[in-house]
Amino acid sequence: MESGDITVRSNLVKYTFRNSSTLILRQGQLLDKIGHAKEIFYTYSQGVYETTIILSNSAEEYVETCFRGEQLVSKAPNLASITVKLPEENSNCSGLYYYIFKKIAWEGINLLEVVSTTNEFTLIVSQDDIDKAFSVVKRLNIA
């Protein structure tokens, strides 16, 4: 991916589980099952009290099996993602995320989750909002 590249994925599902002493083991089991499949979208975020997994709905059965017995807080199907590759100097750019989120909010798009690494960010939205969200992101000119 080059700076400014945009990747859109659809048919995603989000699971949020209450943290437990066994949850990280369950994640390992899931990764054993899906780790070889390059076409599967997967992101994992662990907070203080909850853990969220967002992945392709084609892997739902693995989540249902691997995380059986864990406390499910919520499940949200019919999601989509937009991933943007940022310039390497983005870490030194004050207000970058404010600028992006403001534009998204002005269009009335509900951001369900935001996932980021050093040089890319991923917005998770309802599949119903993906076209509008893509249009907004495409116009941002953040390359």
Regions found by a protein language model. Give the residues of each.
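A conserved regulatory-domain signal marking ACT and ACT-like small-molecule sensing domains
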Residues: 1-143
